[in-house]
């Protein structure tokens, strides 16, 4: 069985104990300014998706205990960039937790893995050049 309504995937929300710190990190890392709704909620909007960052005080609005900050070990937050090597050079002075430097993956993407201040895994990648199919 599946839903009959059309759906659009539009955002990922990170729950954090320190919204300002995490927003500052993602603004610096992506060059995308945040739009603040309240002190507990901000969004970094790109043309293709939105990264929402919310404080722990928002969790009870959904269901108490339904989300916990800094407790993610299964999701990778991914950003496509023009030049992952150039980005790595720009981030090196202030990002303390690189998981791996720029690496070409078996599927061809060039990826840079790091952890944000809450420990979430973040992948900045440059897509592989795709051969044109005739």
Map each language-model feature to its residues:
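Conserved beta-strand-loop-alpha-helix junction that forms the acyl-donor binding cleft
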Residues: 13-18, 106
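Short hydrophobic/aromatic beta-strand micro-patches
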Residues: 15, 78-80
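Short, conserved charged micro-motifs
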Residues: 21, 84-87
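Conserved active-site tyrosine of GNAT-family acetyltransferases
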Residues: 22-27, 91, 119
């Amino acid at each position: 069985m599946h839903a009959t309504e059309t759906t659009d995937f539009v955002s990922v929300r990170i729950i954090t104990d320190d919204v300002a710190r995490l927003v500052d990190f993602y603004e610096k890392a992506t060059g995308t300014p945040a739009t603040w709704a309240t002190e507990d909620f901000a969004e970094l909007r790109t043309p293709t998706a939105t990264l929402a960052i919310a404080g722990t005080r928002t969790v009870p609005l959904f269901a108490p205990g339904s989300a916990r900050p800094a407790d993610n070990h299964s999701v990778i937050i991914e950003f496509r960039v023009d030049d992952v090597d150039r980005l790595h050079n720009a981030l090196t002075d202030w990002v303390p937790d690189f998981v791996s430097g720029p690496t070409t993956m078996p599927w061809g993407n060039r990826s840079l893995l790091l952890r944000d201040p809450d420990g979430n895994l973040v992948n900045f990648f440059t897509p592989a050049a795709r051969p044109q199919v005739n």
